Amino acid sequence: MKSFYHYLLKYRHPKPKDSISEFANQAYEDHSFPKTSTDYHEISSYLELNADYLHTMATFDEAWDQYESEVHGR
């Protein structure tokens, strides 16, 4: 199963055009990001406590919904 982090990396872009691309770039630079996790609560807790680069959790929620839809077919 593909982790959320590995899914998110497909949105990396040298000149981010949206908040998810910006999030992907920053997560890539975050060496403590839970790279193998597929658990919403683990990742959201990490982001709330450690990711000052994420301006709003709505960006994570949008990316998570896309991850669930594309990877898990939900």
UniProtKB/Swiss-Prot annotation:
Q: Which domain of life is it from?
A: Bacteria
Task: Give a Pfam family name.
Answer: YozE_SAM_like
What NCBIfam families does its record include? PRK13672.1
Q: Which family does it belong to?
A: Belongs to the UPF0346 family.
The name on file for this protein is UPF0346 protein YozE
The encoding gene is yozE
